[in-house]
Design a protein with these regions (language model features):
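Generic detector of well-ordered secondary structure
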Residues: 36-39, 244, 275, 318
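Conserved "right-hand" nucleotidyltransferase catalytic core of DNA-directed polymerases
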Residues: 1-7, 14-188, 192, 271, ...
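Short, solvent-exposed helix-helix connector turns and helix-capping sites enriched
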Residues: 22, 125, 200, 231, ...
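Helical catalytic core of nucleic-acid polymerases
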Residues: 11-17, 151-276, 282-283, 300
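Surface-exposed polar/charged interaction patches
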Residues: 92, 123, 138-141, 218, ...
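C-terminal, non-catalytic extensions of nucleic-acid polymerases
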Residues: 107, 118, 146, 152, ...
Length: 501
């Protein structure tokens, strides 16, 4: 949250405070803690400029769901909303006691994957028929995985029980007057497959899918509204509910546990992606696959062929009921399937419309590691606006964006070693340390899990502790360190691209 001070309770909670000095320390900590809580509250209300939370009223979501379904979910974390709402609504719909429903499960020691093939599956190509044959003769145990790969139309499709992935070589790919990067994805893939196939946990019966289908229809209807009219709180809320059901179907502790449901969902998604890719190539033989994801495909093709792909999508929607959304990119910077930048065709520097994934993400959620935000900032400027990384890094004024985070557990010990008047000074670290790489300073050392073996953090570089903010015209930042971090990623993309010629 870029707090000025990062503090922990200065004393163990179980000791008595006996001096005025200790009282002042505790009061200072409490004041900082209240300020942090207020900042986090503002974020949950969407009252922040931080992009991950701006305009996303998470408390409003819970209030809206509470009013609509008469179920108080204000104190539930995101991951519990789907399961808890479904439990309450299902129990209410079927007039059952929640505690009885909680105990329900469908146990199976193994799954014959042939059972998971959708009734609308219509694979034609030799490559994907080999994949289908493998599915039809494979049995997996509840703790086993299923993985295989298929080379189709010049790209490798990697299939696993968790989804489908594929990616072209690292590089920079651009649209022009003749060709365009066309991105397509299935709206709410896993929930939509469940609805398409009428899936429900056997022990819960068909009443389950009625409730589930209602969530799907409401979310899709909301997303179809003009952007200014969409209720993003409801869209995000229904997303949590829908995705939560799929996730919980694979957890033995959940009342929705049934592995056949999980596998029918994922195998159905994989076979849809295979059918989709086949139909695309059949319609436009010279298209180029850029990426394949669990719920979508990104291609490059002639602008004059777009309507042919749209016809393919419309036909597949008729056959499967899965609805497909599309977008156009002017440029993609790809490191791999999980790390890329997509620039939408309507994006401008004044009104950016850019998708950032993996190492290119600038704003992560508060519970994630936001170290070295300057690196993705510089990478975006470099790849999208042709601004040298040195210009971004050396002219950037927000010191927080250069900071890194070190977290250590309770059984480990962290120290900062520096030289003061020709003597080594050892500063004990708290469990969370904020710092940046500097030209002068000290070294970070961690003794893990009570051992005497020390591990050096950012070995070979000096660091400056920054748990407490201070203003300076010259923070003595080691800009070279951050530039090298950027170059590591740039070289993965540009060097490999040059080797293609």
């Amino acid at each position: 949250m870029q707090m000025e001070n990062i503090e922990e309770m200065p004393f163990n909670h179980r000791i008595w405070i006996t001096t005025n000095e200790q009282i002042e320390q505790v009061l200072s900590y409490n004041k900082n803690d209240v300020m942090a809580t207020k900042l986090f509250l503002d974020a949950t209300l969407g009252l922040t400029e931080y992009s991950q939370y701006k305009g996303k009223n998470k408390m409003g979501l819970r209030t809206a769901l509470t009013k609509k379904f008469n179920v108080d979910c204000h104190n539930w974390p995101d991951v519990r909303i789907g399961e808890q709402l479904m439990l309450t609504l299902y129990s209410r719909e079927t007039d059952q006691n929640q505690w009885d429903v909680r105990k329900l499960r469908t146990e199976r020691s193994s799954i014959l994957l042939k059972e998971c093939v959708p009734n609308w599956c219509n694979i034609k190509s030799k490559e994907f028929n080999n994949f289908l044959e493998l599915i039809n003769k494979t049995t997996v145990g509840k703790d086993e995985d299923f993985q295989t790969s298929v080379i189709f139309h010049g790209i490798r499709f990697d299939f696993g029980l968790g989804g489908t992935h594929g990616c072209i070589k690292p590089g920079i790919y651009e649209s022009d007057k003749e060709y365009v990067i066309y991105d397509l994805d299935v709206s709410s893939l896993y929930p939509s497959i469940a609805k398409s196939l009428g899936l429900y946990p056997k022990h819960l019966g068909p009443d389950f899918i009625k409730l589930y289908g209602d969530f799907i229809e409401r979310r899709i209807a909301e997303k179809k509204k003009p952007k200014a009219e969409r209720d993003m709180v409801l869209i995000e809320g229904y997303k949590l509910i829908l995705n939560g059901v799929y996730g919980k179907s694979g957890e033995e502790t959940s009342f929705m546990y049934v592995l056949l449901y999980t596998y029918k969902t994922t195998i159905g998604g994989q076979l849809f992606i295979a059918m989709w890719a086949e139909r695309m190539v059949e319609a436009v033989s010279d298209l180029e696959f850029l990426q394949i994801n669990t719920d979508g495909i990104t291609i490059k093709l002639k602008r004059t062929d777009i309507d042919k792909i749209k016809e393919v999508c419309n036909q597949l929607t008729k056959e499967t009921t899965l609805e497909i959304e599309d977008a156009y990119y002017s440029k993609m910077i790809i490191r791999d399937v999980n790390n890329y930048i997509s620039v939408y065709e309507d994006s401008t520097k004044e009104n950016e419309h850019i998708k950032l994934k993996g190492v290119f993400v600038e704003d992560v959620e508060y519970h994630q590691n936001s170290s070295m935000k300057i690196v993705p900032i510089a990478l975006k400027n470099y790849f999208v606006y042709n601004i040298p990384i040195e210009d971004t890094i050396r002219n950037h004024k927000n010191i927080y964006d250069f900071c890194l985070r070190l977290k250590i557990n309770g059984s480990s010990k962290g120290e900062w070693h520096s030289i003061e008047k020709d003597n080594i000074k050892i500063t004990q670290l708290t469990r969370t340390t904020r710092y940046f790489i500097s030209k002068k300073g000290g070294g970070l050392i961690v003794y893990y899990n009570g051992s005497n073996s020390a591990g050096r953090i950012n070995k070979g570089f000096n660091t400056t502790l920054f748990n407490r903010y201070y203003k300076s015209d010259n923070y003595d930042i080691n800009f070279n360190f951050y530039e090298v971090e950027c170059r590591k990623i740039i070289n993965m993309i540009e060097d490999k691209q040059l080797k293609l010629f």
